[in-house]
């Protein structure tokens, strides 16, 4: 099992995944990222969606790279710190001797 899949599985089992997701959503809303991305989508749809041939998949493909670059560094750092904390907890739990009672 790879490290990323182990972390993914651990975060799902402990409920940390939803906490990380909630933290991300709240931080992106607080910094105005969601509004920026929504406006970007609206502008793209106005520009390219007049003939109804522009699909959701095309919109996602066009917006995703731009939206990722708009995520503030502070939000990225905060999430990385949270994930590192989780990794540290996993490592500490793995290092603890198991009770054989």
UniProtKB/Swiss-Prot annotation:
Transmembrane annotation, as ranges: none
Major location category of this protein: nucleus
Location relative to the cell: Nucleus, Nucleoplasm; Cytoplasm
InterPro entries xref list: TF_ENY2 (IPR018783), TF_EnY2_sf (IPR038212)
Keywords in alphabetical order: Activator, Chromatin regulator, Cytoplasm, mRNA transport, Nucleus, Protein transport, Transcription, Transcription regulation, Translocation, Transport
Pfam families tied to this protein: EnY2
Keyword Isomerase: no
Superkingdom classification of source: Eukaryota
GO molecular function (one): TFIID-class transcription factor complex binding
GO BP term (any one): mRNA export from nucleus
GO CC annotation terms, alphabetical: cytoplasm; DUBm complex; nuclear periphery; nuclear pore; nucleoplasm; SAGA complex; transcription export complex 2
Role noted for this protein: Involved in mRNA export coupled transcription activation by association with both the AMEX and the SAGA complexes. The SAGA complex is a multiprotein complex that activates transcription by remodeling chromatin and mediating histone acetylation and deubiquitination. Within the SAGA complex, participates in a subcomplex that specifically deubiquitinates histone H2B. The SAGA complex is recruited to specific gene promoters by activators, where it is required for transcription. Required for nuclear receptor-mediated transactivation.
Family to which the UniProt record says this protein belongs: Belongs to the ENY2 family.
Subunit structure: Component of the nuclear pore complex (NPC)-associated AMEX complex (anchoring and mRNA export complex), composed of at least e(y)2 and xmas-2. Component of the SAGA transcription coactivator-HAT complexes, at least composed of Ada2b, e(y)2, Pcaf/Gcn5, Taf10 and Nipped-A/Trrap. Within the SAGA complex, e(y)2, Sgf11, and not/nonstop form an additional subcomplex of SAGA called the DUB module (deubiquitination module). Component of the THO complex, composed of at least e(y)2, HPR1, THO2, THOC5, THOC6 and THOC7. Interacts with e(y)1. Interacts with su(Hw) (via zinc fingers).
Protein name in the entry: Enhancer of yellow 2 transcription factor
Organism: Drosophila sechellia
